[in-house]
């Protein structure tokens, strides 16, 4: 299954649109984030995995590929935790995303609570 979640990135004090694309397929279980993520974005894998389980959902035992587009722009910080979580849940057909144009960003605690992010 495939899902897309709108988010925002920060370049100094300027924001730019980021599309979080999530593709879940059969195969060897794995969780990869591509699209020039920094260490904090790569660490989202563990925060999101814990948050999904602690919010009462089942984390998919599948191959998960997340693309942060535009792929040529470096992504940094923890603000992608929430859109990554929503992308996985939407691609797993566990939640429906709103049809309206909105962007999601926020850091997640391991228990699934939202935390503020710098610059927003």
Model-derived segments and spans:
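Peripheral, non-AAA+ core regions of ATP-driven protein-machinery
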Residues: 1-120
